[in-house]
């Protein structure tokens, strides 16, 4: 069965097959809908449904959460990466415009260095086999992991400095039962994998001279690290604070790097807090990373600060509310959810 899909923004009509993935429809039709994670995590492909919402089937809870976290009404918008065609459909404007910077596109990268950080977290350094990579701190790459029956796409934030045009690094936690995370975690020097990108709107504010507060939990430190390295390499001494939350001592990583950066950049203030530390062996702060907002951020400071948050959705939402309550303008809070 064939269904007509109309893209009002591009003035394109395309005949899609029953059950065809809307990402494939957009690609085949040449529609200008932007895509990034292709897994319902980022909200990049959110598009207004003008007519035929019933043709997309029911929404998943994850899709609703992603739309709402991007300030979009789930009754008016759908994530096209999570939708299949089951009837006549008319689509309106995309919620997010296409990026002006052309991505590297699809390419093969080779593992240059594998660096274990904890028992479950590693840093992988990749060499771009052909071409050069240009990315903004905070962006991510999509990895094409070969599965049993098909290729699985997973997004990983770049953790390295953007000045290196031939290499990039990511931070990976091997999750129990996670096929993709374990596959990438097991890669070793010389191994190759296909990637595409870079993508993402989680970027540093252009031209801002306000102080900076960065909040990260777990491997959410990856894009924050890229931002931090970029900022500390610039001229200027505006105050930069990092609140880094982990569970226990065995989860600690990047501590030496953060300590070294503090020694060489006195205006950088990293703070590490553990939520579930062992009874002994941790002399530092204990609690949740959001506790630090209440304890260490004043209302005067919040009014002159840009915030960058990366971690699980509950932490992001709580931190946003706390910062807004402190007087921070919501437009100065940028975030990336990790799943």
Residue ranges and their predicted role:
Residues 1-79, 83, 233, 239-339:
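Reductase modules of NAD(P)H-dependent flavoproteins
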Residues 21, 28, 44, 88-90, ...:
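Residue-level marker of beta-strand positions
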Residues 68-117, 121-126:
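Fe-S ferredoxin-like electron-transfer domains
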Residues 85, 97, 147-150, 197-202:
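Short, charged beta-turn/beta-strand-edge "cap" motif at the junction between a beta-strand
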Residues 103-191, 210, 246-248, 273-277:
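Ferredoxin-reductase
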Residues 138, 220, 312:
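Short, conserved phosphate/pyrophosphate- and ester-handling motifs at nucleotide-, phospho-/glycolipid
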Residues 225-233:
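Histidine-anchored nucleotide/phosphate-binding helix
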């Amino acid at each position: 069965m064939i269904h007509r899909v109309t893209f009002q923004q591009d003035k394109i009509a395309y005949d899609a097959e029953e059950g065809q993935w809307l990402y494939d429809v957009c690609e085949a039709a040449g529609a200008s809908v932007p895509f990034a994670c292709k897994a319902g995590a980022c909200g990049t492909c959110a598009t207004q449904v003008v007519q035929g919402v019933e043709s997309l089937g029911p929404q998943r809870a994850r899709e609703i959460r992603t739309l709402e976290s991007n300030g979009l009404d789930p009754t008016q918008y759908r994530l096209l990466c999570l939708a299949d065609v089951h009837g006549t459909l008319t689509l309106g404007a995309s919620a997010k415009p296409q990026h002006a910077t052309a991505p590297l596109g699809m390419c093969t990268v080779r593992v240059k260095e594998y660096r274990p950080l904890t028992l479950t977290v590693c840093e992988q350094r990749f060499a771009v086999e052909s071409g050069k990579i240009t990315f903004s701190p905070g962006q991510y790459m999509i990895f094409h992991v070969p599965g049993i029956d098909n290729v699985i796409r997973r997004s990983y934030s770049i953790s390295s400095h953007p000045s290196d045009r031939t290499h990039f690094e990511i931070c990976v936690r091997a999750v129990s039962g996670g096929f993709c995370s374990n596959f990438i975690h097991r890669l070793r020097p010389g191994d190759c994998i296909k990637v595409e990108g870079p993508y993402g709107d989680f970027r540093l504010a252009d031209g801002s001279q306000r102080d900076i507060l960065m909040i990260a939990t777990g491997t959410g430190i990856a894009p924050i690290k890229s931002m931090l390295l970029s900022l500390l390499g610039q001229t200027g001494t505006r105050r930069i604070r990092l609140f880094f939350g982990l569970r226990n001592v065995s989860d600690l990583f990047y501590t030496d790097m953060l300590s070294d950066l503090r020694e060489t950049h006195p205006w950088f203030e990293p703070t590490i807090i553990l939520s579930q530390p062992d009874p002994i062996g941790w002399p530092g702060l204990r609690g949740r990373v959001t506790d630090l907002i209440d304890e260490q951020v004043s209302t005067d400071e919040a009014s002159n600060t840009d915030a960058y948050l990366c971690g699980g959705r509950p932490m992001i939402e709580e931190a946003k509310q706390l910062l807004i309550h402190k007087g921070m303008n919501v437009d100065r809070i940028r975030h990336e959810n990790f799943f």
